[in-house]
């Protein structure tokens, strides 16, 4: 576990360290691939979302570790274990249950949701997914800039890598 990026801010009496990126490293017993995988979560999530699925199945991190990849789980700055500071990063947002259910519930608003069977309403897996959501910065542009700066530092440290993203973390 380590942190990359970030900066000191504030005045001489009250300095803060902010905008750093929390990173966990998982190395398989036998590495089979030259490039590690950096996994970067989407909005409202943390690196924990790569470790296990809401219904208890193996997460992507364990899958790739089992296949011989070194895996870096990174948390976007100002989110989760990459501390957020209100005086530096401003207000945060949080997904509402209604906004998340639009992806999973058959409410008639999205035609494709009628075919959805993975998250039947009230299912424990959906509750686990909803419970895993955290606050995030309201501006994707601000989030992207912070990830760009800290991600650059991570790549300087580890070298070339495969970047695996989810949702808001994508290109």
Please provide the spans of the model-predicted regions.
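Conserved acidic catalytic loop of the alpha/beta-hydrolase fold
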Residues: 125-162
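Short beta-strand element of the alpha/beta-hydrolase
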Residues: 33-42
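Low-complexity, serine/threonine/proline-enriched polar segments
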Residues: 89-128
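Serine-hydrolase catalytic-loop signature spanning alpha/beta hydrolases and amidase-signature enzymes
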Residues: 44-52, 71
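Conserved alpha/beta-hydrolase
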Residues: 57-84
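Gly/Ala-rich beta-loop-alpha elbow adjacent to hydrolase catalytic centers
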Residues: 164-170
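N-terminal cap/lid segment of alpha/beta-hydrolase-fold proteins
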Residues: 1-32
């Amino acid at each position: 576990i380590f942190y990359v990026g970030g900066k000191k801010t504030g005045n001489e009496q009250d300095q803060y360290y902010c905008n750093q990126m929390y990173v966990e490293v998982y190395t398989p017993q036998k590495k089979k691939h030259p490039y590690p995988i950096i996994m970067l979560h989407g909005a409202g999530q943390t690196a924990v979302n790569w470790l296990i699925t809401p219904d208890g199945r193996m997460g992507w991190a364990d899958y790739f570790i089992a296949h011989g990849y070194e895996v870096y789980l990174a948390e976007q700055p100002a989110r989760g274990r990459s501390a957020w500071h209100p005086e530096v990063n401003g207000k945060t947002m949080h997904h509402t249950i209604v906004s998340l259910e639009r992806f999973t519930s058959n409410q008639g608003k999205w035609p494709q949701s009628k075919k959805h069977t993975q998250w039947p309403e009230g299912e424990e897996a959906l509750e686990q997914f909803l419970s895993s959501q955290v606050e995030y910065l309201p501006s994707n542009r601000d989030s992207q800039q912070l990830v760009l700066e800290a991600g650059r530092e991570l790549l300087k440290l580890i070298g070339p890598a495969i970047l695996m993203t989810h949702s808001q973390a994508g290109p």
